[in-house]
């Protein structure tokens, strides 16, 4: 039996409308009441995820910003790995002139965007988290957990992914959380490495963990955990990268809570 359950949120545990269904909430409460450790493992910001956790009324670790931040059961920050200042500063303005690509910055407790995009707020059904606008040359690049780029066209983000990797190499970890969202963290940052740290803190190892995800930002976590489950609606790139992993149903079908009920509660 896996003692640690780690799950991504968007595209995985959350419904397509970015909410937690009642069917999803119940097993999380039952699992944690039985002593199984649930871990949120997401690209979302810790301020946002903390509200989701509090609304659920469960104790859980939070891996946020794709592993750049880890908070304990009481919400205390126990791990932080920021982008180097020079990289963060350059990323703030790298596509500022492209009207099709929005630049987002997570810095400590704040979220910044380089221009308004009201539709981003559709992700915040379970929490209240608002962005502020920034000017690239005026934003202090200290404490930046990640910079991410959103665009309706995946094809426009592909050359940006290649350019960032070519420029900074292993000083960054670049991955697509969705086809329309390219995320940049410091080198060595991943949900998988953060999960390893959390498991160790709990007295377990990665082999005691089961993980669920749908994005390329879940790749390390899914492959490093004792059991990794890929969502049926996941990027094909992720399925191709890890053909050895089990593919389950979709978030529209509440596949993760179904799986957890069968594994732990039946």
Swiss-Prot record:
Magnesium. Can also use other divalent metal cations as manganese, cobalt or zinc. Phosphate binds at residues 9, 42-43, 191, 217. The active site is at residue 8. Its EC number is 3.1.3.74, 3.1.3.23. The keyword Lyase does not apply. It catalyses: pyridoxal 5'-phosphate + H2O = pyridoxal + phosphate; sugar phosphate + H2O = sugar + phosphate. InterPro entries: Cof, HAD-like_sf, HAD-SF_hydro_IIB, HAD_sf. Mg(2+) binds at residues 8, 10, 214. One of its GO terms (molecular function) is magnesium ion binding. It is an enzyme of class 3 (hydrolase). PROSITE patterns: COF_1, COF_2. Keywords: Hydrolase, Magnesium, Metal-binding. Its cofactor is Mg(2+); Mn(2+); Co(2+); Zn(2+). Belongs to the HAD-like hydrolase superfamily. Cof family. Catalyzes the dephosphorylation of pyridoxal-phosphate (PLP) and sugar phosphate. This is Pyridoxal phosphate phosphatase YigL. The gene is yigL.
């Amino acid at each position: 039996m896996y003692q640690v359950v780690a799950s991504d949120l968007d595209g995985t545990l959350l419904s397509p409308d970015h909410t937690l269904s009642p069917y999803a909430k119940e097993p999380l409460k039952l699992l944690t009441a039985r002593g199984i450790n649930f871990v949120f493992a997401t690209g979302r910001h810790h301020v946002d995820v903390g509200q989701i956790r509090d609304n659920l009324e469960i104790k859980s670790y939070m891996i946020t910003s794709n592993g750049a931040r880890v908070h304990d059961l009481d919400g205390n920050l126990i791990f932080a790995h920021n982008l180097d200042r020079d990289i963060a500063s350059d990323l703030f303005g790298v596509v500022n002139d492209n009207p099709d690509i929005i630049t987002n910055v997570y810095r400590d407790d704040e979220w910044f965007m380089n221009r308004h995009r009201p539709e981003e707020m559709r992700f915040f059904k379970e929490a209240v988290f608002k962005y502020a606008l920034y000017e690239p040359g005026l934003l202090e690049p200290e404490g930046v957990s990640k910079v991410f780029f959103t665009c309706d066209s995946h094809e426009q983000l592909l050359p940006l992914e290649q350019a960032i990797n070519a420029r900074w190499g292993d000083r960054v970890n670049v991955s697509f959380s969705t086809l329309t969202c390219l995320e940049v963290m410091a080198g060595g940052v991943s949900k998988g490495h953060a999960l390893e740290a959390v498991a160790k803190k709990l007295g377990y190892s990665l082999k005691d963990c089961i993980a669920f995800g749908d994005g390329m930002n879940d790749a390390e976590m899914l492959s490093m955990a004792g059991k990794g489950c890929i969502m049926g609606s996941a990027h094909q790139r992720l399925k191709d990268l890890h053909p050895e992993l089990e593919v389950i149903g979709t978030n529209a079908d509440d596949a993760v809570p179904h799986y957890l009920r069968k594994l732990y509660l039946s």
